[in-house]
């Protein structure tokens, strides 16, 4: 009986040490996936601006997923085509950024000369600690509080923290 108590105590100690490390590793993986998602959005916006709406950017993820006439492939994968998209513990959004009306795209959708994309943890402190955002300048910014940096913070001289 005593041996069983010792074994249970040892297992409990191992779990007490390993579970927090596992949670930190999972949050780090979620944050890396969120960064990857925002980079994907930035790349899709660059392709969209060059091919579908010269100088204009989509303001909805669904617009990026819509192929131009004569093509069967959109600019972003279907798993990121829902506004907002939920991936790996983060909510990915695309919204109008600072800019003015751009040209209509190949499908007749309105565009802007700027966009604002964000990745915010579903549950700050559980699914991720940091939030991320990007604009048409394609620089990712980070906020350690779990709230995405604002458009104003990401403007030149706005005081935002670029992701290193």
Residue ranges and their predicted role:
Residues 1-22:
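N-terminal single-pass transmembrane signal-anchor helix
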Residues 3-6, 29, 48:
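Hydrophobic side chains within alpha-helical segments
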Residues 18, 25, 45:
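Conserved alpha-helical elements of the SDR catalytic core
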Residues 21-38:
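Aliphatic-rich helix starts adjacent to a transmembrane/signal segment
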Residues 40-130, 134-139, 144, 157-164:
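Extracellular/periplasmic head regions of type IV pilus-like filament subunits
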């Amino acid at each position: 009986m005593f041996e069983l108590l010792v074994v249970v105590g040892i297992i409990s100690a191992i779990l007490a040490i390993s579970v927090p490390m596992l949670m930190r590793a999972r949050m780090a993986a979620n944050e890396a996936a969120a960064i990857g998602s925002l980079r994907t959005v930035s790349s899709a916006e660059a392709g969209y601006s060059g091919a579908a709406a010269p100088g204009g950017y989509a303001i909805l993820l669904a617009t990026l997923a819509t192929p131009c006439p004569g093509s069967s492939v959109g600019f972003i994968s279907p798993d990121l085509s829902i506004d907002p998209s939920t991936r790996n513990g983060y909510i990915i959004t695309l919204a109008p950024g600072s800019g003015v009306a751009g040209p209509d795209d190949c499908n007749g959708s309105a565009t802007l000369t700027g966009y604002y994309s964000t990745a915010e943890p579903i549950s700050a402190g559980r699914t991720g600690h940091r939030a991320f955002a990007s604009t048409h300048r394609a620089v990712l910014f980070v906020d350690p509080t779990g709230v995405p940096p604002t458009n104003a913070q990401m403007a030149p001289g706005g005081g935002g923290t670029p992701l290193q």
